[in-house]
Amino acid sequence: KPNPHDVDITHEEKLNTALTNLEHFYNKGVAYLTLAHFYENDCAPPVFPWPEYALSHGDWESLLSKWDEDKGLTDIGEAVVEKMFELGMLLDISHCTLKARKRIYEIAEHHHAEECIFASHVGAFEVNRLTYNLQDWELKWLGNHGGVAGIIFMNYWISPVDTQLGLKYIEQTVDHIINVAGSDVPAIGTDFDGFTD
């Protein structure tokens, strides 16, 4: 039978490992960290990565139950975020759930580290209503604190319909972000693929 203290030790070991690794990479010159990606990790859960119309393009439907968008930062995630701000590292909120993003903003405000937050590759929620994309209040928050939102060049995240007109939606997304948050907020954020249809 597992001892509950073993779980605590394991959790503490994970936390210590996460913070040690973070400091190691910071000391090697790593400037920022993307806290979440396609699958849950020790820090934060991700949003489901595909719009409903794209489910037919892969085996994503069978994986739907693996994402819980009602989750926020883990305890380890909170400690990592606080340590990042203490070190002065930048934090990329791309792929984080809305609940995790809200908590990151709160921690940033508490530590006076708002300028450390950015989104490297996202869209605008009002252009394509996916929880992956930033809502208007988040875009304004970034604008008020010197942050940027890199526009992803991927139709799945910037277009509400299955289309080949990617450039049109890039333009709409940039225009929307400028109208909501100012011209200093939108940036090029192609992600690793750097493409649109």
Model regions: which residues?
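Extended, charged catalytic domains and RNA/DNA-binding interfaces, predominantly
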Residues: 1-187
